[in-house]
A protein has these predicted regions:
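Intrinsically disordered, low-complexity serine/threonine- and proline-rich regulatory segments
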Residues: 1-7
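A charged, amphipathic interaction segment
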Residues: 60-129
């Protein structure tokens, strides 16, 4: 799946939440979290363009969610991918433990890292270094 994603062969329908998580897990293998974040940021925006999903302030790439999942998965990336996918930090709803939906789905959080407004993350977020 990672190769299909990186090489532009993953369809829009195949780009599910689980596909995002697996891609993130693979990106973290042999890379620092900051390197994985950079790779994923570029690859997701490119993928979105390739499948007709515009990267705007209301759709496409979401920086705060990407930072959240790279950070969460980097804490457990030494585990097999199936265990990572089963982590409570990797569910679709997990970020809502830390952000209100309005803040997380708002334009500022989509375009740049926005710190949580409900509770602090249990780990320091992976940001560009």
């Amino acid at each position: 799946m990672f190769d299909a994603f990186i090489n532009g062969r993953l369809s829009k329908d195949e780009w599910t939440h689980e596909a995002h998580l697996i891609t993130c897990w693979v990106a973290l293998q042999g890379r620092t979290p900051a390197e994985a974040l950079s790779l994923l940021r570029d690859s997701i925006t490119t993928h979105n363009c390739g499948v007709g999903t515009p990267n705007t302030d209301t759709s496409g790439y979401h920086e705060s969610l990407t930072v959240y999942y790279v950070t969460a998965i980097s804490q457990i990336s030494h585990l097999p991918s199936a265990d990572t996918l089963a982590s409570p930090h990797c569910t679709r709803e997990a970020p809502l433990q830390y952000w209100t939906k309005d803040v997380l789905m708002g334009t500022p959080a989509r375009l740049a890292w926005v710190a949580p407004d409900v509770a602090p993350l249990p780990w320091a977020p992976v940001l560009d270094q």
